[in-house]
Amino acid sequence: MKVGILFSGGKDSALAAILLSPFAQIELATVSFGIVPNDAASVARVLGFPHVIIGLEAALATATVDAMIEDGYPNRGINHLHKTALERAAARYQIVADGTRRDDKAPLLNVREARSLEDRSAIDYVRPLLGYGRRAIDALADAHLEVAYGECISFDYEVELRRVMESSYGSEAVEAVFPQEHIQSRVTGRKSVVF
């Protein structure tokens, strides 16, 4: 059984891969507009999983940024983009997973949206971290991963959307739309765990 996991290079998607790996063949899939350099493949190698990049059109980035500017907040745009990323992954895999967790606001599909994705695409959509809160995720990451933290250091589409927004609307728009001090994670290694 092969599972395609949407992969940003951060701890959530890495933990999703580790949790599913005893039960499935894992392939990490990074969705990218090709706007900024993407080295998620090196993080995938550190984790020991194969990696692919799924390309998205620049027009989608522009439309997503325009929606964020209209809303003054990123959630609707991020959720729309995440749904598109899942649909693109569904064209490649029978089982699609991501690293969304219980406390996420965006990206996050509700149950109706998840069922719709599965029905329309004839796939299974798996969210192995959905029952975990932030403290549990942090504890798992601390036990199994070496992680760096900072702003815009992962390879998720938010980094590219920030760049498009800055180019089109200026840095003030980025500061107004995106939460201040949004800390991201980037996996730098995998710890050996002995039970």
Predicted regions located by residue number:
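Nucleotide-activated chemistry modules centered on ATP-dependent adenylation/adenylyltransferase
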Residues: M1-G4, G9-F195
